[in-house]
C-alpha cells in the first residue's frame, strides 16, 4: 500500500473511538463504595455476634437492633452497587466507535452493552440519510454539551461521550470537522 492510498482511504473513512465505563472515575467510585460498604457490613455483623471483626471500631457497643441492622443493610446495598459498577467496568459497557464511511456509503454507530441478546449495539444508516450535525449546549450546575447526528426519519443519535463535558472550543471544533467530513450543516451553534 502506498502513502497516497492510505491518505485517500483516510479521506473516505473516519472512525472516532468512544470511551466506555473504563474511566478513572468509575474505578475510583467502585473501589471507594466497596471499601465503605464492606466496613458498614462488618460493623453490622460484629454488632450481631457481639465481637469485633473490625479491630479499630468497638462494634460490640453498637446494638444490633436498630443500628447494627441498618448498618448491615447499607453495607449489603453498597456492596451490590459496587459489584454492579465493577461488572460495567469488566464488560466495558458503552465502549465503541462512530464510523463514517464514504467508500461504502454508511454511518455506523457501535457500542458494547450489557451481556445478553443486545450485547452488541450496531446502528448502520446510509450516509445520504444524514441531515445535519446538531450541537446542544446547556450551561449551569450540570452543564451538558452534546453532539447529535440527525438522521432522516429517525431520532437524533448522541455521539459524544458521557462524563466530563467538553469545552466550547472542543465541541465546536469536533462538530465542524464532522460536518465538513459528512458535508452537512451544523445546527444549534
Swiss-Prot record:
GO terms for cellular component: chloroplast thylakoid membrane; photosystem I. Coiled coil: none annotated. Pfam families: Ycf4 (PF02392). One of its GO terms (biological process) is photosynthesis. InterPro entries: PSI_Ycf4_assembly (IPR003359). It is a multi-pass membrane protein. Keywords: Chloroplast, Membrane, Photosynthesis, Plastid, Thylakoid, Transmembrane, Transmembrane helix. PANTHER family: PHOTOSYSTEM I ASSEMBLY PROTEIN YCF4, PTHR33288. Belongs to the Ycf4 family. This is Photosystem I assembly protein Ycf4. The gene is ycf4.
